[in-house]
Amino acid sequence: RAVTQADYENLAYRMHPKFGAIKRCSVQKDLDSQKRNLNMYIVSEDTAGKLTLANSTIKNNLKVWLNQYRMINDTIDILDPYILNFGVNFVVKPQKMSDKFLVIERCVEALKEHFRQPLFIGEALYISDIYEVLKNVTGVLDVVKANIYIKSGGDYSNSSIEIEKNLSSDGSYLAVPNNAIMELKFPDVDILGKSR
């Protein structure tokens, strides 16, 4: 039986893969509803491991799957989250005897590993974590600057967010709406680093 929002998320992840795979799921109470209506945001992966909106077959299969376990008074709307693609810019100061090109390469690899798995739906993106990752790279003396930017159109999602309006007051994280998910889609081109 599914009682809590976490129960529903757990059930969605446990749906048999032959009915479709869900990469990320977030269940939230529908604040516009007087009844016990829940909004379930789901996203899938394509064959390249990139986030993609779940197709109608997966959504229908999920609805049938959840109906076996839901409380009689619960209604569930299965919705698409906004996929927000982003990139990272950074400037580091290498240690004196370090090869600056090798240091930049190590920094890019460390960030690729950090963002290998997409964040969860509604999860904040911590810019402070980017600083921390870069600071721990061998050969980095100091992290001069690190920021994120939105990538949209073409091979990227068409969704966007105003970064300045959604940054925390201290600039340490980007608040992400509950119906959105951040993805570093093409790390080989979306991470740009310089040395100073």
Regions found by a protein language model. Give the residues of each.
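Carbohydrate-recognition loop of C-type lectin domains
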Residues: 1-124, 184, 191-196
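An aromatic-glycine-centered, glycine-rich loop/turn in mixed alpha/beta architecture
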Residues: 1, 102-196
